[in-house]
Amino acid sequence: MTTNNITTLLDLIAEGNSSPKEFLQKIDPYQLSRIIYPRFHGTPDHVLCKGLPIQSGDVNGILVLGKDVANAIATNKLNKQNTPSYVYSTPGGDVSDFSAIQTCSAYFTSNPARTEFCAVQSVLEGKPTIIDIPVTYHEEDEDRIIELVTSTGITQEVKTKHRWISYTQPDGKTTTVTEGTPISVSGETGEIFLKQLQIDESPIDYIYETLTECYLEAARDEEDPYPWNSLQETRTFSRNRTKLQQAINSSTFIGFQKVLQHAISISAPSILCNVHRPACIAKAKLVSSVITFDNEGLKIASDKEKYGIGLLRDERMWVDQEDIDILRVLLLGPGTTSIENYQKFCSMYTQRHGNRYRKIFATGVGSTCVARTLCMPISKFLPDDFDIDGFAIKHGLDPLKSKAVFNRMTSEREIYHGCRGIRMFMIRPDLLKLWLMTVLRAYQASERVNGQTKITFLLATLTFPEEARRFIHTLEECLLDLWESIESSPVAGVATMLETGGAFISIEDILSAHGQDIEMIGGLVGVNDFTTACLNMNRNDAPKFMIPSYVESAMLKTSPFSSIETTVVG
């Protein structure tokens, strides 16, 4: 079904000449996504190569291969309209790539794993994302000046290294694309194009994105107790008022909302989203709401039971370089510096990280909030080639002691089963308490907004029942420091990820763990965990050869990255 046909069906629904039920019977999610996201006009040509799309949307941008170029674009003094749009690409990455991903228009990588570190971050940011692009990355030390031109013709010069990607076709012909080249990326087809293409805007995407921006602008006024009531007072709303009113009152959006509300009425789903910043939960709230715009202005009718935070991902919140350095100091520990200096970093963590949590909670968490322990391999914060000597000098640490701790902690070979999640907190109970108090204080400050909504803590990499018991014990201590009783606190309980063989073997004992009032209330299993714990395959290696080969030989009916193999997990 073409985009025009889908739009026509929505028009008929808006006019009352067709039903949402009939619409849902005629289309599939892939077809529906064609009207939800921006799409290239017509049939594009000039294809360089193709990978596997994992997040939809079609965009134009300048190819950026280095963090220095991305940071130069993000920190320029031009306004948003005059900031160059760029497509970011790396073969892999770590937490230092997060800022580049947050401000890019799309991301692609040669890595074939859906769980590749930067690809996951890109999907969480809502960026068109493609994995398994068959290109090779190149870099030379020679200096090069890149001229970045905006849509309004303003030029920004960036000094950087010489970088490019290359693609070799089946006939042996190789095409190279240098950093700074204008390209287009399709998150629908997975194709990279060697020219910038015309894009048809989606009114649905425009409405949700613009209203999210309105909320974020209103929320910057920390004196405003409920920013949702102030959307129409923002500059973003003022600039977009006429276009917003037309889009919201369009038959396409009216029909889409009727379809959405019909789906909600017959299945009563909750929109539970991955969250690492306020925009995530703000957009989830908007999607679950009924939005109208009449002579009295914009109206958003929300039901908190229809959306919530399914997974609050602490590890994905670390974007700012200064904040990342704070966490690095804490990971290296109090033995690397003076007590006074270490306490300074603890205070900075509490203030800055707590402020991030407070802004998320103040948005309104909806029906539920599941907060997960810091689930980040150490190698993504402290890679093997990290300049530990320079870092120690910069932040007032003892270089020799810092290097000794660094050498002991780093060089993890199996990073995803390394020292992260509950393992780090068991080794460093001081960090566990610091994290819990930071999250709980932020949630306490938002109790007026969230009412009776409960928070559940989710433990990553848990293997031993004792780990669950110790976490619960520390949690109860923190709760009694902040509330009169544990019963009066907003904590529903504790759950565990099932991502280690030990967790599967000991699941009954783990789920039996409890404290005075807090107990284990459930578990969560996902694709990554299935691959590593059930199949005992490295989750980065598995998609390249082993799993495709098992599917080809009919050992598995489908890839576990698209369905669960019940013969293994029951």
Region annotations inferred by a language model:
Residues M1-P29, Y37, V185, A218, ...:
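Conserved catalytic alpha/beta cores of large enzymes that bind or transform nucleotide phosphates
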Residues M1-T75, T174, E191, D529:
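Cysteine-dependent phosphatase catalytic core of the protein tyrosine phosphatase
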Residues T3, G180, Y416-H417:
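Catalytic P-loop NTP-binding/switch module of NTPases
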Residues I6-L10, K21, S105, E116-V123, ...:
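Predominant activation on well-ordered alpha-helical scaffold segments within soluble catalytic domains
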Residues A14-E15, L124, D303, D481:
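Residues at alpha-helix termini
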Residues E15, P29, L124, L332, ...:
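Short, well-ordered loop/turn and helix-capping segments at boundaries between secondary-structure elements
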Residues Y37, I54-S85, T90-L312, W318-L330:
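Acidic, glycine-rich flexible loop/linker segments
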Residues E223, N240-G570:
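Conserved alpha/beta-domain cores
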